[in-house]
Amino acid sequence: MSWGAMHSNNYQNKIQKECSFTRFPILCVQTLMGFESTKHQQHIHLMSALVNKSIAESKLPTSYFSNFSSQLLAKDSQGVRAVTDHCEEMMSMSLKRLEKSLLALQNSPTKNKDDIQTWLGAALTFQQTCKDSVNSLGLSERNEVIKKISQKMDYLSQLTSNPLALVNRIARASYPKNSTYNRRLDEEQGDFPNWVSAKNRKLLQAPRINANVIVAQDGTGNYRTVSEAISAASGNRFVIYVKAGVYKEKIRTNKDGITLIGDGKYTTIITGDDNARRGTSMPATATFTITGDGFIARDIGFHNTAGPQGEQALALNVASDHTVFYRCSIAGYQDTLYALALRQFYRDTDIYGTIDFIFGNAAAVFQNCYLVLRRPKGSYNAITANGRTDPGQNTGFSLQNCKIAAGSDYAPVKHKYNSYLGRPWKQYSRAVVMQSSIDDSISSSGWVEWPGAGGYAKTLYFAEYANVGPGAATSNRVKWPGFHVIGPDVAVKFTVANFIAGTSWLPSTGVIFDGGL
């Protein structure tokens, strides 16, 4: 055997071994066989090659979706255009996270593992979101255009899943063996993750704010609308103080470093009433949409007043990394909060809704929040609907020290309906409710299937720990393989400080948190 053949066999053996840890090993091997050289034999270069392939395949021509739009024969041409526009945006956001992942891999995969896990997982989420949008058109899957888009998104998802699986191996290997201890936070730092800098921490806690601009409806500020203030934002951290009032606006921003501070969660309110029944696509119904990173909100409300008859009607659509909502109110009915992707932290925030009113695929922790069930249009309520599509994603919803209760409109009639802690939107849905107060609005079964998705019961991860109240008993909970009543050794993994599948947005060492069980 020649040296070249031996080298080739060694390389092939190596990639077959590495690819055996992925969900799509055949595609993994096919991808890496195109990168046969000595420099690619290092583990890091294999992962970079896989991400590079995802990037290359994600760089679709600008005409890609518009061509599909013109080919689709649909009654609602406006709806088709909205969906294809949304797909273009999702692909742009996916590409951004893939490119950030590649740069982080090239710098230091071990040091940056948390970021890489989050960004690759988000890229997957954005790809799946495009597919979901296309499927929401209600056209037959036999439609060739629909099939092409769905197949393309599935292919991209498989390409992206493979490097994520390999990065997760690095994360598991480097994670401290004694990872179930309880972290506490020194008191001067408050209850915020370490990526909330000391400056921003003080900003969130300060009784008065030194704002860059002031918004006031009566003309006493720099601007009369929140939209105008955000348009003027510049710099790394731009603080906008919004005086008391109800601001009827529909806002969308991709700017990084925006901070909104109001006079109180029910005193300063940004509100809208767009809804799916009006013909607007689900994501576009949001009163406030944020895709820029580092968004912070304090003492302000985000509402959608479409009511239950409006069907899907979002108050918030959040695809921002390192996001904080502190002492806010988020009010709607169906699909109130779209926690779409990336790392999100909610503290002392009131969230109102009916069906799936916290949904999406972010790595999100809700601490000390008040989750209010409203009277539904349909037959039942479900608080969470997590959209995790890949077991390698570090995503999920953790509800800790929350209060779950019926609202004033629901309490008198709650005996007529069932309410649940959540249902699995996607195959690997993950939600944990712990140390929370649960009133008797919640059904004794606790959780409910997604219609037509009974198989998810084996692949989802739903768990409860140390909850109290008349709705907290677990003896009659669902008997699914994926449902767990956990102990403290497992529950601690889902605290703000130590959410194992979401450690990319939390410190791995050093800073201590108050998130104890």
Locations of the language-model features?
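Membrane-lumen (extracellular) interface motif
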Residues: A5, S108-T110, Y338
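Extended, amphipathic alpha-helical segments that serve as helical scaffolds
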Residues: H40-Q127
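Functionally engaged cysteine thiol sites
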Residues: C19, C28, H86-C87, M91-S94, ...
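Sequence-level preference for short, compositionally simple segments enriched
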Residues: I44, S136-Y155, T160-L517
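Signal-peptide-cleavage-adjacent N-terminal segments of secreted and extracellular proteins
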Residues: M1-L72, S197-T220, R224-I240, K250, ...
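Amphipathic alpha-helical hairpins/coiled-coils and adjacent low-complexity
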Residues: R81, E99-L102, Q106-S161, N168
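Generic preference for well-ordered alpha-helical elements
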Residues: Q12, P25, S58, T84, ...
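Amphipathic, well-ordered alpha-helical segments in soluble domains
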Residues: F24-L27, T31, E57-Y64, M90-K100, ...
